[in-house]
Regions:
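Active-site/ligand-binding-proximal alpha/beta "capping" segment
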Residues: 92-129, 194
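Zn-dependent metallopeptidase/amidohydrolase metal-coordination segment
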Residues: 133-171
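His/Asp/Glu-rich mid-to-C-terminal helical/loop segments that flank catalytic regions of hydrolases
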Residues: 159-194
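Alpha-helix C-terminal capping segments
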Residues: 22-30, 43, 124-126, 140-148
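General beta-strand structural signal in soluble alpha/beta enzymes
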Residues: 2, 31-35, 51, 101-107, ...
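Metabolite-binding pocket within alpha/beta catalytic cores that recognizes anionic/polar moieties
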Residues: 1-78
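Generic non-transmembrane alpha-helical segments
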Residues: 85, 89-99, 182-193
Length: 194
């Protein structure tokens, strides 16, 4: 699937996660997600690939709110939202191909504004390494449907440090486009080996 529905575009969570429901009905067993995110970890630089090991959900609406879908339990366990075997496989492939990767916790927020310096600092103190405006709702619904998940973020901008850095959508897209071949190489090889 290319692209996604974003909550900040005015879609509700049922709309945002509908493609995942369709994928479940089609029988997929593994979901690969990617996104562009702002890095808050001091060891990150623009263009880094961050393998998502966990997430923090800061969206104002939960994708499982309301009547429970029969695809999963009312209260799904999220202790391993991102499959550790897939993370290990990605690490192995990245090492083989000399592709540097980072690991971290992704925070999903509503958007559409980029974060203020104070928000970056707060999110980092809460345990996030990167922040973006997608991914978390889709991952929650995938896990509710017993679909394994692998996630990767392209660090497209940096925030939360002593010097505030302005960011534009164009710069984010430019950084994402530059990192895309490395990300694609890892994911393509993962699919071959899965």
């Amino acid at each position: 699937m290319k692209g996604r529905f974003h909550f900040y575009e005015g879609y509700n969570m049922k709309d945002v996660t509908f493609p995942i429901r369709v994928m479940h009905e089609l029988g997929i067993e593994t979901l690969f997600v990617s996104n562009a995110s702002g890095g808050m970890n001091p060891s990150f630089k623009i263009g880094d690939l961050m393998i998502i090991t966990d997430h923090i959900n800061m969206f104002p609406e939960h994708p499982l709110r309301g009547r429970n879908f029969p695809t999963g339990p009312r209260f799904p366990d999220m202790h391993e939202a991102y499959d550790h075997k897939l993370v290990d496989l990605a690490d192995s492939i990245a090492k083989e191909k000399n592709i540097e990767v980072q690991h971290g916790v992704y925070m999903g927020v509503q958007g559409p504004t980029f974060e203020t310096p104070a928000e970056y600092r707060m999110y980092h103190k809460l345990g996030a390494d990167a922040v973006g405006m997608s991914t978390v709702p889709e991952v929650i619904v995938a896990r509710h449907s017993d679909i394994k998940v692998f996630g990767i973020s392209v660090i497209t901008d940096l925030g939360g440090f002593d010097v505030p850095v302005k960011v534009s959508h164009e710069e984010v897209q430019e950084a994402a486009n530059a990192a895309q071949p490395r990300m694609t190489e890892i994911m393509r090889e993962m699919i071959k080996r899965s």
